[in-house]
Amino acid sequence: AKQEIMFYATQAREAYPYYQHERIGYNYRMSNICAGIGRGQMTVADAHVAHHKHTCDLYRELLKDVKGITLHENPSGRFDSNYWLNTIVLDPLLRVKGQENAYQATVQGAVGGAGGVTHVAVNAHTDCEPNANVEAMRMGLDAMGIESRPLWKPMHKQPVYKNCPAYVNGVSESLFKVGLCLPSGPYVTDRDIEYIVGGIRGLIER
């Protein structure tokens, strides 16, 4: 019973390398203490944003000559992203080592450092999932101790919402298939980023 309660209180995620919801869950975990800590964090918000922007700049510099990988950018000078999360997209034709083994087994537990309780997946595949090269990149980075994760699965493709109306144009599905989130937190160092990009480069088949 406790596990089931925690399952619903920690987003009700199934055991896939991306967010897969077959039941509606919640995120009921903030206490007054956590709220107080959040207020305290506002005093370092500017420093964190500056760090995130620096992190993106370094990813951009180190990935600029890697064919088949694109780092997200501001669409124009009218935008000023805080880059709280850095994401890349992989060209579907990019070959990644081990992609023939992607989705050969179900995931055990949460992925990418996420907490909470997950249900055991019945099948490694769903009707909407990242491309094999994206999953291979995630798995390869994980083997190096690097946490990464696919982009968020579109809400209208979550089983729990399958009977709900949706107005779509295909963009969210196409991005989900090719996108990968990279470590971007305030404690990610320049050396960490160099290691991460080295891992990405090493996983690409030449």
Give the location of each predicted region:
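PLP-dependent aminotransferase class I/II
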Residues: 2-206
